[in-house]
Regions:
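Conserved alpha-helical scaffold segments that buttress catalytic/binding sites
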Residues: 2-297
């Protein structure tokens, strides 16, 4: 079924929330939007090109006050990204925002909070509920769900005094691996959040989980966060944390298609794909195919 929405692509090539892969290198997720464009994202989605929100320069050190890497830059970038997303929503577009790492969620959530209360469907291989006190990297990309729901330094949780950007009771977390191979990611979604781990998809089936998600948001407009590390590395290894297990592309498509075809879904972001880890661009083709099938077929 083709989308009757006005789709808009807004690139958010920020790597500010990740640790450097080496002392003299930056994370390669910043190349994701360009590579997806090279593989036909705009034409396949029949979307309007709304340009790029350029991030501040990446700094390798961790902010001493917040214990978050690039904290001030993420704060400033969130303001810029929120402005651009807000304008697209005001004009009636369905924004599709390729990152970038998961810290771009702060700008998205700020844009939504300025407009009222929205839900968040958080599809991710990890819960991203770390804090500066238990994160070994200081990367906001592992803290983003905690930050947008009000836990963490006020510089990032209370931009414009709007904390929390998303109420915990309005969040559904889907696809996270548990037990988590990353022993640092000890936090599980707790009530009032809704938690649907990878095992729920595997035991109940993607159709059941997709229907449950749509039911969860039947009375609340929501945004879709999609971190492609939710996929099994057999299909998507070009991520910073390619842990064992994960969804199949078919199961993920079933859930994403159901979510974005809901009239309650107002937009989505895609994060963490790193083209520098994917020389044959298999991951890029998978992402473009998935989005095209979910939104246009």
């Amino acid at each position: 079924m083709r989308s009757h929405r006005r789709l808009a692509i807004l690139d958010a090539p920020s790597n500010l929330g990740l640790k450097p892969p080496a002392p003299d290198r930056e994370p390669g997720v910043r190349y994701m939007p360009n590579v997806l464009r090279e593989h036909g994202l705009l034409t396949r989605l029949r979307a309007e090109d709304c340009g790029t929100v350029v991030p501040p320069p990446y700094v390798h050190s961790i902010d001493s006050e917040t214990k978050v890497r690039n904290a001030r830059a993420i704060h400033d970038y969130s303001l810029a990204l929120a402005g651009s997303i807000g304008r697209l929503l005001y004009r009636g577009f369905f924004p599709i925002v390729p990152g970038g790492d998961c810290s771009i969620l702060l700008g998205v959530a700020l844009a939504l909070r300025r407009r009222g209360n929205f839900g968040l469907l958080f599809i991710d291989g990890h819960t991203d509920l770390l804090t500066p006190d238990n994160s070994e990297t200081g990367g906001a990309a592992g803290m983003d769900l905690a930050l947008v729901t009000g836990t963490g330094p006020r510089l990032l949780t209370s931009i414009e005094g709007l904390a929390p950007f998303v109420k915990p009771e309005d969040v559904a977390v889907l696809g996270y691996r548990w037990p988590d191979p990353d022993s640092r990611s000890i936090a599980l979604p707790a009530e009032p959040m809704t938690g649907l781990p990878l095992g729920s998809v595997q035991s109940n089936g993607a159709d059941y989980v997709a229907a449950k998600v749509v039911k969860r948001f039947e009375s609340l407009s929501f945004w879709l966060h999609l971190d492609v590390d939710v996929l099994n590395p057999a299909w998507m290894s070009a991520v910073d944390s390619p842990d064992p297990g994960g969804m199949t592309p078919d199961d993920l498509l079933t859930i994403v298609r159901s979510a974005v075809q809901s009239s309650r879904c107002v937009g989505m972001e895609i994060t963490i794909y790193d083209p520098t880890l994917d020389p044959d661009r298999q991951g890029a083709r998978l992402i473009v195919d998935l989005l095209s099938k979910a939104l246009q077929e």
